[in-house]
Amino acid sequence: MPAARTGTLAAVALILLCGAAVLGRPAPDDLCFADVRRTGMAPSRPLGPVLNLAASDLTSRVSVRAVDASRGCALALLDMAETVVPGGPRAADVVDVGWAYQDGDCMVPLAYRQYFNCTGGALPGQNVCAGLSETRIRGGFGTSDYALYGTSLVLRPGLYDRGTYIYFLGYGPDDIYVGSVTLMVGADIHKYPCGLDRGLGVALHHKSGPARPLTEDDATGDWACGCFPAVVEVDVVWGNVSAAELGLADPIDYADEGGEVEVLEDEAGSASGNLPQDDPDPDLADCRTVGLFSESDMFRTARGPESLLIGAVAKDVLTVPLNLPPGRSYEALRNASLECNSRPRETGDAAVVVMSLQEPARLERRPDARATDPEFGLFGLPDDPAVRRGILIGLAIALLVLLFSLVIVLVCACRLARAAKAARRARAATFAKSNPAYEPMLRV
C-alpha cells in the first residue's frame, strides 16, 4: 500500500530527525523454549506497593525515544535505554520498572517489577541487583503474551502490536525516568505461518480479518524466521504449573455452573473463558488514565521466576493453529526457522530500521480483509495520536530548520551585496582621483 509505505517510512525518518535512538533486535534464540524452566534468580519477595502513576505522569516525562522493528514470527525484545537516567542507572535499595502501551490519552499496563539492593552502573537485572520481586504482567483471562527479561519486554508481535510502548525506571515517587519505543511491525500477514493478524490493538478498536492458507510459493525468503520452540506436550509439561505462577486467572474463576470452562472464540479469534453470569465481564482493553499499575482482571501478579514467564510466552506457539503450506510439518518449519535465524542480519542502527521496513505489509484489497489495513486518516497521517503527533512535531522541526537556513542564506547574500557595492565605490573613487576630468561624474 503506497499510503502505508509512505506513512511508516515518514514516521521512522522523522523520529530519526528528532535524534531518537534506533533499536532493532529479536530475542536471542535461547529464549525460544516451551518447556517449564525455573532457572536463574527466583522472586525473593512479593511485589510491594506500586508507584501511583497516571498516564500523563509518564507522557510528560519521556526523555528518550527509540524505534524498533519486527518482522515475521519473531520473539522480540523491547529494550530500555540506559541513557534514560542522566549519568546512568544509580545504586538504590529499590528500583521500580514498568512497561505500558500507549493508546491516545490512556495506557494499557503490560509489566511491572521491583529490583532490590542494586549496585548501579547498568540497568537493573540479576547481575546488578541482589533480589527481585514477583512480576505483574498482562494476561488475565487469556494467554501469556508478555514477560520481562531483566528490564526488557518480551513479546511475539502481531500486526496490531504496532504503536508506542512507554517504560520507566523509578527510584521513588518523585524520581522517575521515562522513555518510549515505537514498534513498527513490517510483515505481510499472508506470508508467515504464525497468524500475524493479531495483537493488543485488537482489544483496542481494531478488528482482525481471516487469513488465507499459505501456499508452497509463500514458503520463500524469511517466511520461517522467528520463534518455533521444540515440541513438548504442553498439557502434560505445563499441567503442574499453577495459574498464580503465570499471573493468569484460575480456571475456576470463569467456570460455568457445571464446573467446566466454556471456551469461546472472540472477534479476534482468541480463546477466552466465559465468566459466570452474575459477575461483570472483564475489561479486556484495560486502558487507563490513572492507577496504571494497580492489579486488575487483565493485569495480575505472577509468582513464577523470570524463565518460567518467558517460556509461557514462547510455548503459546504450540497451542495456536499454524498456517502451514500443504505437506509441511511443524518440525520442518522449526528446522527452517533455525536456518533462517542463523543468517547474518543487517548491522548499523539506521540500516536495521530502514532495511526492515522497505518491504512493509502489502495487505490485499479484499472486502473481507479491509479491516487489516493500517489506519491512515486525513492527508495520509496515521490515526494513532502518538504517531501522528510525532510526525507533526518532526515536520515542524524540519520547517524551522529550513527557515533558519533560509535566513542564514539571505543574511550572507546581503553582506556579499554590500561588500560588492563598497568595492565598486572604492574603485570609482580611485579612478576619479587619477582622472580629474571624470570627478564630476562620481556619485557618492
From Swiss-Prot:
The chain crosses the membrane at residues 390-414. The keyword Transmembrane applies. Glycans are attached at N117, N240, N335. Residues 1-24 form the signal peptide. It is found in: Membrane. Keywords: Glycoprotein, Membrane, Signal, Transmembrane, Transmembrane helix. The keyword Signal applies. GO terms for cellular component: membrane. It is a single-pass membrane protein. Belongs to the herpesviridae glycoprotein G family. This is Glycoprotein GX. The lineage of its organism: Viruses, Duplodnaviria, Heunggongvirae, Peploviricota, Herviviricetes.
